[in-house]
Amino acid sequence: MTGPRVRTVTAAALRAQPLPAPGGDKEQRGRVLIVGGSARVPGAVMLAGEAALRAGAGKLQLATAASVAPGMALAMPEALVLGLGENGQGEIVRGHRALDAAMSACDAAVIGPGMASTNTTAALVKRAIDQAVCTLVLDAGALSPRLRAPLGRPFVLTPHAGEMAALAGDDKAAVEAAPADYALAFAKKMRSVVIVKGADSFVAGPDGALWVHRGGVPGLGTSGSGDTLAGLIAGFAARGCDALTAALWGVFVHATAGKQLAKRIGTVGFLAREIPPEVPGILDRLPRG
């Protein structure tokens, strides 16, 4: 019995799944909402937000801990920033009507960067998911084995091997030995697009489609790198890509940015904040449909 066909994510393959035309209006390129962060880790939301804008999204909203929201608004003038209730540890624990309205009005959202995975944050994640009518990218603190996307509206889940192991209740070594199998199984179980990130990143769709991007550079294994990937995917989704296409473009562009930085700065040591500025030039050089 043969396994599923594995397709390779390349620039040529993406030609068959082109991005929507850039257009001249920010409304046409969509609105992205990033929900996450904490008083101790506010930067994750900013990394994802900048990546979404660099991918071409037209508008950006950030929802994070109220104590850091004013500073974030000053640091990122391109974004509308919402402050959320937090507990004594600075973790966001409560949504509100403004977040509900933002979630129901966005074209793509990222939930989870910089968030801890706790019972209290789980309630916030559930509330946000329940309000959403857009493509959702779930990362870090939003990942849960209980997730299951609505029929016809797959989530995009972006676990690394350790997070995938936690979702599966297995050890990390098992995931690293068979990442494609885990991606396929959980894509079907969660009715979602699942990216198991690594040097070779596997992307599986709920219909059994399986893709691999090979040759990621070691320097991408750095703090905040996954936040930029999640933001890129949301940016492409906001522009009009379906969940799988947005994931494939995100993985390829993220890896290409890493290769450029490795060549210019060094194999390791470049920073996650340096990834988003690479993106517009990469998009201009990639083949168009």
Curated annotation (Swiss-Prot):
Keywords: ATP-binding, Lyase, NAD, NADP, Nucleotide-binding
Top-level taxon: Bacteria
Binding site for AMP: 197-201, 226
Record bears the keyword ATP-binding: yes
InterPro entries assigned to the protein according to its UniProt record, in alphabetical order: CARKD, Ribokinase-like
Chemical reaction(s) catalysed: (6S)-NADHX + ADP = AMP + phosphate + NADH + H(+); (6S)-NADPHX + ADP = AMP + phosphate + NADPH + H(+)
First-tier enzyme category under EC: lyase
Pfam family, one: Carb_kinase
Domain YjeF C-terminal per the UniProt entry, residue ranges: 9-286
Coiled-coil residues: none
Gene3D superfamilies, per the entry: 3.40.1190.20
Cofactors, names only: Mg(2+)
GO biological process: metabolite repair; nicotinamide nucleotide metabolic process
Keyword NADP included in the entry's annotation: yes
UniProt-recorded Gene Ontology molecular function terms: ADP-dependent NAD(P)H-hydrate dehydratase activity; ATP binding; NAD(P)HX epimerase activity
PROSITE patterns: YJEF_C_3
Function: Catalyzes the dehydration of the S-form of NAD(P)HX at the expense of ADP, which is converted to AMP. Together with NAD(P)HX epimerase, which catalyzes the epimerization of the S- and R-forms, the enzyme allows the repair of both epimers of NAD(P)HX, a damaged form of NAD(P)H that is a result of enzymatic or heat-dependent hydration.
Quaternary assembly: Homotetramer.
Protein name: ADP-dependent (S)-NAD(P)H-hydrate dehydratase
Organism: Xanthomonas campestris pv. campestris (strain ATCC 33913 / DSM 3586 / NCPPB 528 / LMG 568 / P 25)
Gene: nnrD
